[in-house]
């Protein structure tokens, strides 16, 4: 199949995936008026049909659409061309009938901003890589020293009280407009409280499950950051009980206007990658023959994130130029990377450990550009081996 035809098929598949994600968001929004929900679902159905061949589009009515959203997505998507992806078997609702945490990120990462969509969805929506770019456009205006400070703060202070955040961000505080009030985010509130993830400090999602709530970090639940919340019988917060191996004790904070958090895009594409970089730095710290530089560029500190050098006497030096990524979809990440002008050869893209099984898919997309793909744990083992240190 010609390259142009493969690209067109992939665009139609992205369009259908976007429609499904948007429909799930509409279906699961508890405050959306029924009339508004119906109109949004009709919009989504129109976009989905437009992605299919006419004979298949005629077979998908509203009943088939809504039923299809409750199971694996394969029957709703145009066939994949070339290398298969994971979306045929993906389900957007969980076992409790609630939208999966990642739906919003998948939607923004696969959104096709073209006229065919805009005629159905006139509201402004921005591709994920454009939001990522907006963040780093602000960052690039900082001096190298300020840039490194801001990147670190995105990882360590992405949410909290206004007093604490302004103290930590200090002179950088007034230069960022990415913070929003937790009081405006009902999805993370329970009994007037919110719980920061012990890993990223961002608000954890609270989902009612019978008389209790499931509380989990959207990004770190695979690592065991999830809890069960029991409603309080009196004043004050209820009881939060860990249900995962990484569910350490967390202090509840009031869901008031003086508690802020970076917006979702900054958390996904700013905070989470920094945490991967800091995790890697901390795991490798103290190894013999090792030198590490965080955001090393003086002219362009954002060129890549971490430079690792291993210089064992009598052996050739080993270098890793690391760029951490925390996209929900490695398919969309691969397309964004291949479209990026001047992608540096010799770069190593590092993914979270829970995307280990997907790293080969991304590697196949960027291999021709001289870029390698691995995960945090795999790279840490490789560097330790190069240093001659025990794993």
Model-identified regions with their sequence ranges:
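Beta-rich nucleic-acid/ligand-interaction surfaces
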Residues: 212, 298-309
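Acidic-basic catalytic patches of nuclease active cores, encompassing PD-(D/E)XK
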Residues: 240-298
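Catalytic cores of nucleic-acid endonucleases
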Residues: 324-372
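Metal-dependent nuclease catalytic core centered on acidic motifs
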Residues: 94, 137-145, 250-255, 357-365, ...
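Nuclease-adjacent, charged terminal/linker segments that flank catalytic cores
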Residues: 3-250
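C-terminal helix of von Willebrand factor
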Residues: 372-391
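Conserved catalytic cores of phosphodiester-cleaving nucleases, focusing on short active-site segments
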Residues: 280, 284, 304-334
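A structural signal for short secondary-structure junctions
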Residues: 299-301, 314, 341-344
